[in-house]
Amino acid sequence: MAGSGGLGGGAGDLQGAGTGQGTALRALRAPLALVVLLLSAYCLFALPGRCPPAARAPAPVPAPAEPPHTSLRLRAPGLPVASGPGRRRFPQALIVGVKKGGTRALLEFLRLHPDVRALGSEPHFFDRCYDRGLAWYRGLMPRTLDGQITMEKTPSYFVTQEAPRRIHGMSPDTKLIVVVRNPVTRAISDYAQTLSKTPGLPSFRALAFRHGLGPVDTAWSAVRIGLYAQHLDNWLRYFPLSHFLFVSGERLVSDPAGEVGRVQDFLGLKRVVTDKHFYFNATKGFPCLKKAQGSGRPRCLGKSKGRPHPRVPEAVVQRLQAFYRPFNRKFYQMTGQDFGWD
């Protein structure tokens, strides 16, 4: 009987313990669910490098019978323009770089041209979303008529190792536009953008030099992007130099019509976008587009364009200029252009 009583007491203890554990688990369930919800939201919205949601892309279109790439030349004068909404095509031209070089400005200026149709957002297909496939990528593109050029811009392509090979696989005839800027001012602008989104960031100097005092830290992306010659070496393994146009980010500000004119020539377009389309906004220190007929006001780029840069000590600037000088000179030799950064 004593044994029976002992077993009975043990069962009671287990039942009580089970009840206590169930209560504790129920008490933990709500905060655990909240943690999971918050982590899911963070992964969805905060983590970098995400592809555009597939649901936002139009349904993939079947491959056309003819080659997807049309000539960059304009249609002959007098020929009728194809009627209807047109077709989605792979881009014949890409703005592949560089970040904080002036790529958004160039794209907006080119969109004034009636024979240019450009995707407004950056699809990041050849760096982040390649596994979604070419049909998905083409489905993102705006519809174009025969004789119009499809374009997109994603500045990170220029510094992505796999991008040249992937773009060449899409079409070896792709025209490539690279907007470059003094790598020192580009790095400071890059830092300013990051600082605006991440208050409390270490100083520019602390990030640019190892331990703030040592050699230049090329592991920091703001520094590494400016090694233009190294990145171009990778691209020239797949495309000849004749497929590139290098646009000066500085001249895009001081002479937008001149630089956009060079781009129109490169694409085989008539020079439709000219100096009559621009005016200089002294407040922003940046060119803006004059208002179109029927429009209430001129168009300037977003408020982030022309944001003031943080003050960087002159000694830091000089050290970076000295670091970039040999890379700049090699880039001048490779492109046949002197951008005047030294």
Curated annotation (Swiss-Prot):
InterPro entries attached to this UniProt entry: NST/OST (IPR037359), P-loop_NTPase (IPR027417), Sulfotransferase_dom (IPR000863)
Record topological domains on the Cytoplasmic side: 1-31
Distribution of this protein across tissues and organs: Expressed in liver and kidney, followed by heart, brain, lung and testis.
Record's keyword annotation contains Transferase: yes
E.C. number(s) listed in UniProt: 2.8.2.23
UniProt keyword annotations, A-Z: Disulfide bond, Glycoprotein, Golgi apparatus, Membrane, Signal-anchor, Transferase, Transmembrane, Transmembrane helix
Secretion signal, residue range per the UniProt entry: none
Any one of the GO BP annotations: heparan sulfate proteoglycan biosynthetic process
Annotated spans, Disordered: 56-75
Glycosylated position list: N281
Ranges of the Lumenal topological domain: 50-342
The keyword Hydrolase belongs to this UniProt entry's keyword annotation: no
Record-listed 3'-phosphoadenylyl sulfate binding positions: K100, G101, G102, T103, R104, R181, S189, K305, G306, R307, P308, H309
Residue stretches spanning the membrane: 32-49
Molecular function via GO: [heparan sulfate]-glucosamine 3-sulfotransferase activity
Subcellular location: Golgi apparatus membrane
Family named by the database record: Belongs to the sulfotransferase 1 family.
Name the record gives this protein: Heparan sulfate glucosamine 3-O-sulfotransferase 6
Protein source organism: Mus musculus
